[in-house]
């Protein structure tokens, strides 16, 4: 068993499940206990870092873009570990300055994401990170926002992919996930 496989098993045991959250009929996969455990959090970042260095090499990735809310929790640590920049993708009204925006539907309501226009230079290479890939709508919107400013998405990286929802079918770049369910 590789180190990454061993780490994935440890990470999986830390997830907590909440039934009927955020809406009735849904099961929420909570990865916050991982961040509360420094050893597991380091293993999470190490697993992503190792994967990205093996796949792309340090010179090819320019930015990690973290999707609000949970992508903002581990994205900066991953960017720091890789020695690249970090860019937050936030809900409307959370970022100062000129922002690009996109409106999308999530579950039963519309949301708007924004990103500062000057945060990612034209032609940059970006990896998008978030905790869970479900239907793919949130990740798709984040990717569309990054493409609006002329950057390239190398990959979408997730802690967990809910395979039964086929979210990867909406995405135009490869995905990587530590766990699948």
From Swiss-Prot:
GO terms for biological process: adenine salvage; AMP salvage; purine ribonucleoside salvage. Its EC number is 2.4.2.7. Gene3D superfamilies: 3.40.50.2020. CDD domains: PRTases_typeI. It is an enzyme of class 2 (transferase). The modification N-acetylserine is found at residue 2. One of its GO terms (molecular function) is AMP binding. Pathway: Purine metabolism; AMP biosynthesis via salvage pathway; AMP from adenine: step 1/1. The keyword Secreted does not apply. It is found in: Cytoplasm. GO terms for cellular component: cytoplasm. Keywords: Acetylation, Cytoplasm, Glycosyltransferase, Purine salvage, Transferase. It catalyses: AMP + diphosphate = 5-phospho-alpha-D-ribose 1-diphosphate + adenine. Present with 937 molecules/cell in log phase SD medium. Catalyzes a salvage reaction resulting in the formation of AMP, that is energically less costly than de novo synthesis. May lack catalytic activity. Belongs to the purine/pyrimidine phosphoribosyltransferase family. This is Adenine phosphoribosyltransferase 2. The gene is APT2.
């Amino acid at each position: 068993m590789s180190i990454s496989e061993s780490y994935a098993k440890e990470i999986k045991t830390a997830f907590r499940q909440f039934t009927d959250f955020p809406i009735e009929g849904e099961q929420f996969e909570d990865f916050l206990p991982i961040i509360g455990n420094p050893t597991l959090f380091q293993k999470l970042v190490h697993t992503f870092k190792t994967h990205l260095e093996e796949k792309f090499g340090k010179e090819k990735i320019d930015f990690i873009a973290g999707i609000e809310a949970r992508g903002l929790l581990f994205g900066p640590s991953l960017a720091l570990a890789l020695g690249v920049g970090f860019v937050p993708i936030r809900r409307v009204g959370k970022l100062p300055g000129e922002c690009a925006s996109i409106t999308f539907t999530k579950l039963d309501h519309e949301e708007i994401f924004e990103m500062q226009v000057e945060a990612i230079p034209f032609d940059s290479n970006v990896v998008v990170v978030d905790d869970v890939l479900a239907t793919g709508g949130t990740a798709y919107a984040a990717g569309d926002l990054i493409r609006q400013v002329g950057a390239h998405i190398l990959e979408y990286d997730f802690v967990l992919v809910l395979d039964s929802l086929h979210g990867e079918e909406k995405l135009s770049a490869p995905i990587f996930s530590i766990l699948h369910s």
